[in-house]
């Protein structure tokens, strides 16, 4: 059985060994847990964002960063590229931000390998038939605050490991690492929608790849939450190899997956969020999806694609001006 925690540990150790190069800070808490500050009190870096994203994906994906000129010849943004041969485990079993970590006054959205020990949420792991077994727990936190010993103790208890074997990586939304890792969810947005909104068995997805632009750091966490989500919703492109069964309507799946199928399509995410009174649960689940979806049905040999990138919404989201 693949272990997302054990597969991610060498990446964590690499980040610790290269902390100065990556502009990170490593903190050992009094209870022995290790905290990696990837953007709260430090600058972080794109390379750190790449490694942070690989850890979010449980060490089961290749992550790269490049400049893509295919969106618009005037709007040039770096892009994060993802590919994985274990889509269900890497994206839903690890990367999905499925753990709301709330301890005292501390709150963060948790993603990454430790979720597969704590089974957060349990229903997801039942759907993909996966659970990790490891004596270490690695959790990625999206927060503008660093966790303390109480948070580490909470994670250790939920994961069933000694607190000295807990690694907590922290990056605010409004940071380079935060921007990279959110765009790095481009494949996961598709598998999440397959499972949660379309009730498709994601274990049939045998390989997945995706690319999405990375948002510039343009303001506080709220503004960045809007911009980072828009990168995937209006700029993300994904490719899925699906081994269908008789009776699976893969063409319908492909048409239903992209963000353009949502009623709120065409508006920057922050605008939609405001209209929902800043309540994620009031937002159409269909909006959390890549802009373009291509599916290769391995059973039938058919190749199909639906959706399109929307550069105008990206420019509006970023308040981009061509000088």
From Swiss-Prot:
GO terms for molecular function: methenyltetrahydromethanopterin cyclohydrolase activity. GO terms for cellular component: cytoplasm. Keywords: Cytoplasm, Hydrolase, Methanogenesis, One-carbon metabolism. Its main location: cytoplasm. Its EC number is 3.5.4.27. It is an enzyme of class 3 (hydrolase). It catalyses: 5,10-methenyl-5,6,7,8-tetrahydromethanopterin + H2O = N(5)-formyl-5,6,7,8-tetrahydromethanopterin + H(+). Pfam families: MCH. It comes from the Archaea. GO terms for biological process: methanogenesis, from carbon dioxide; one-carbon metabolic process. Pathway: One-carbon metabolism; methanogenesis from CO(2); 5,10-methenyl-5,6,7,8-tetrahydromethanopterin from CO(2): step 3/3. It is found in: Cytoplasm. InterPro entries: METHMP_CycHdrlase. Belongs to the MCH family. Catalyzes the reversible interconversion of 5-formyl-H(4)MPT to methenyl-H(4)MPT(+). This is Methenyltetrahydromethanopterin cyclohydrolase. The lineage of its organism: Archaea, Methanobacteriati, Methanobacteriota, Methanomada group, Methanococci. The gene is mch.
């Amino acid at each position: 059985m693949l272990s997302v925690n054990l597969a991610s540990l060498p990446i964590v150790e690499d980040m610790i060994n290269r902390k100065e190069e990556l502009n990170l800070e490593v903190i050992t808490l009094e209870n022995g847990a290790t905290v990696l500050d990837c953007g709260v009190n430090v600058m972080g870096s794109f390379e750190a964002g790449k490694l942070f994203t690989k850890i979010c994906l449980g060490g089961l994906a290749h992550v790269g960063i490049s400049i893509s000129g295919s969106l618009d010849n005037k709007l040039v943004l770096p892009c994060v590229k993802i590919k994985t041969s274990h889509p269900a485990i890497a994206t839903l079993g690890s990367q999905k931000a499925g753990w709301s970590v709330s301890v005292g006054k501390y709150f963060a959205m948790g993603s990454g390998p430790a979720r597969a020990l704590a089974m957060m949420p349990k229903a997801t792991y039942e759907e993909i038939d996966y659970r990790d077994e490891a004596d270490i727990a690695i959790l990625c936190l999206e927060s503008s605050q660093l966790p303390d010993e109480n948070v580490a103790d909470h994670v250790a208890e939920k994961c069933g490991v000694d607190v000295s074997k807990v690694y907590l990586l922290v990056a605010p939304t409004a940071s380079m690492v935060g921007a990279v890792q959110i765009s790095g969810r481009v494949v996961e947005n598709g598998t999440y929608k397959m499972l949660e909104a379309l009730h498709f068995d994601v274990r049939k997805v045998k390989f997945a790849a995706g690319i999405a632009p990375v948002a510039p750091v343009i303001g506080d966490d709220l503004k960045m939450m809007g911009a980072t989500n828009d990168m995937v919703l209006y700029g993300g492109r994904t490719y899925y190899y699906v081994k269908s069964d008789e009776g699976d309507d893969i063409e319908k799946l492909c048409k239903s997956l992209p963000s353009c199928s949502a009623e709120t399509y065409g508006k920057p995410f922050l605008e939609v969020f405001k209209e929902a009174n800043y309540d994620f649960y009031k937002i159409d689940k269909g909006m959390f999806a890549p802009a373009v979806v291509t599916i290769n049905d391995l059973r039938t040999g058919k190749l199909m694609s639906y959706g399109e990138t929307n550069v105008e919404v990206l420019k509006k989201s970023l308040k981009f001006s061509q000088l």
